[in-house]
């Protein structure tokens, strides 16, 4: 039974992420926590949730499962996902969130020692959830006198203080810098505005009440959903704007003209600063195949190098790079950043704090100026799930044949890079019946058209 996707378990609360599933996953996590021969603290599981209306019931179900699996629960209540991850250092954690999904969805993310479960741990959870409690003792509740206890625990003050302290190592004091923060009625409202004010910013907050109905805008921060923030920044005095999704693991930046800054430009700015600030012999930035070559340009200019890993596998990429002797200073997918110097989790709140101090130091325009910003597009080509493997095998030959002057990498899809810095990536969607085509080029429409035609031909031929 495959439960976990690239970002935990996620789906409708009516059919997918049900209370029954939450109990079973909680019990499996409790068993996982108590099976380790370690300090007693490691048999604790911190449980938190975002502001979704179904979060309270699902958190109670997870707690019942964890405690019946023999581990103790520490209830964090409503918190950002990065705060839950922060609290899970030295123990396990479960976060109830569907991130940027619609309000009728929810999800489960599992952590250990500040890092999301790797695929091996996820498989163990899946096996225990699928097992029959009547025949498999590991799937059944522990003995009545071995159940764990449950207590409230507060983490927000400690998390906010830790983020502010870390961010002060970069950039300059905010000194009244005007910042607009669109929390999207998500739990980022409990952290980012307070931290930025503590750092000296003048903060104006939009959609700052936590509400699981997401009445202000859809939870996913896109140029369209951020129309109010964009107008607010363009018409007001804010130096820039910040937006989060429902659980504050994502961050979007809006410039003073009210335009969203491309996610890869934000990634390149932070990556370059971390490399320049590092005294490591081999500073590494880990990112994904769909990330722009502008990141490579700025990281290389700063004296570092870029390693790419499949989408949803940043932690694996960090481990691989460090095993090879590199010192990972930053890891990111577009809009989702890991700050290894602070913690091993995706953290949009910390990104907001660090970026704010960088902007206060130099201005957003100056930070963007050295970044090559070519036009970027992503399109989807229809492809039945059953054809994807054969289509991708065909494209491993067809793309090089169609673009003989390109450098080809087939480790995570088919990526073609050209001498002028433009590139394209073709990869199958993991959740929908499409093959995705990503491209960045001065004439991006022409490149996307040529690549899409090759993909459509491969789909038709299979």
Which residues fall in each region the model found?
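An N-terminal, well-structured beta->alpha segment
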Residues: 1-62, 68-69, 91-92, 148-176
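Short glycine-rich phosphate-binding loop at a beta-alpha junction
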Residues: 40-50, 74, 178-179, 283-289, ...
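N-terminal small/polar loop signature for handling phosphorylated ligands or for N-terminal nucleophile
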Residues: 46-105, 195-254
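Proline/glycine-rich low-complexity loops and linkers
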Residues: 67, 76, 130-159, 255-334, ...
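A short, gly/pro- and small-residue-rich
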Residues: 104-132, 254-267, 342-355
């Amino acid at each position: 039974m495959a439960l976990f996707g690239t970002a935990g378990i996620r789906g409708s609360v009516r059919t997918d992420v049900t209370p029954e599933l939450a109990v079973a996953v909680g019990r499996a996590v409790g068993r996982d926590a108590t099976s380790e021969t370690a300090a007693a603290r490691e048999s604790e599981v911190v449980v938190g949730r975002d502001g979704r209306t179904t979060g309270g019931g699902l958190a109670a179900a997870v707690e019942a499962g964890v405690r019946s699996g023999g581990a103790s629960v520490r209830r964090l209540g409503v918190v950002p996902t990065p705060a839950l991850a922060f609290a899970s250092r030295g123990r396990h954690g479960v976060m109830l969130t569907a991130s940027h999904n619609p309000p009728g969805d929810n999800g489960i993310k599992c952590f250990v020692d500040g890092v999301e479960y790797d695929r091996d741990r996820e498989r163990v959870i899946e096996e225990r959830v699928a097992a029959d409690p009547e025949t498999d003792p590991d799937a059944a509740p522990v003995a009545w006198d071995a159940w764990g206890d449950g207590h409230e625990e507060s983490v927000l003050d400690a998390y906010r203080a830790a983020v502010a302290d870390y961010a002060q190592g970069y950039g300059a004091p905010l000194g009244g810098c005007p910042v607009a923060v669109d929390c999207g009625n998500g739990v980022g409202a409990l952290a980012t505005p307070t931290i930025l004010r503590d750092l000296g910013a003048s903060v104006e907050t939009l959609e700052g009440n936590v509400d699981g109905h997401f009445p202000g805008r859809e939870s996913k921060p896109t140029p369209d959903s951020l129309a109010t923030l964009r107008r607010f920044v363009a018409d007001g005095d804010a130096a820039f704007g910040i937006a989060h999704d429902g659980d504050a693991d994502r961050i979007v930046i809006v410039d003073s003209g009210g335009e969203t800054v491309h996610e890869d430009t934000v990634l390149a700015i932070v990556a370059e600063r971390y490399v320049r600030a590092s005294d490591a012999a081999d500073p590494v930035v880990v990112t994904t195949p769909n990330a722009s070559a502008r990141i490579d340009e700025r990281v290389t200019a700063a004296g570092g190098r870029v390693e790419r890993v499949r989408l949803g596998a940043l932690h694996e990429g960090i481990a691989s790079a460090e095993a090879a002797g590199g010192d990972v200073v930053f890891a990111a997918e577009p809009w989702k950043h890991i700050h290894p110097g602070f913690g091993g989790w995706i953290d949009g709140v910390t990104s907001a704090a660090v970026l704010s101090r960088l902007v206060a130091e130099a201005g957003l325009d100056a930070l963007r100026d050295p970044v090559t910003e070519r036009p970027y597009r992503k399109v989807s080509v229809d492809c039945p799930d059953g054809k994807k493997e054969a289509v991708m095998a065909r494209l491993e030959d067809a793309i090089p044949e169609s673009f003989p002057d390109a450098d080809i990498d087939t480790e995570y899809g088919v990526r073609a890079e050209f001498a002028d810095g433009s590139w394209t990536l073709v990869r199958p969607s993991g959740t929908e019946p499409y093959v995705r085509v990503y491209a960045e080029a001065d004439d991006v429409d022409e490149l996307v058209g040529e690549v899409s035609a090759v993909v459509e031909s491969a789909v038709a031929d299979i």
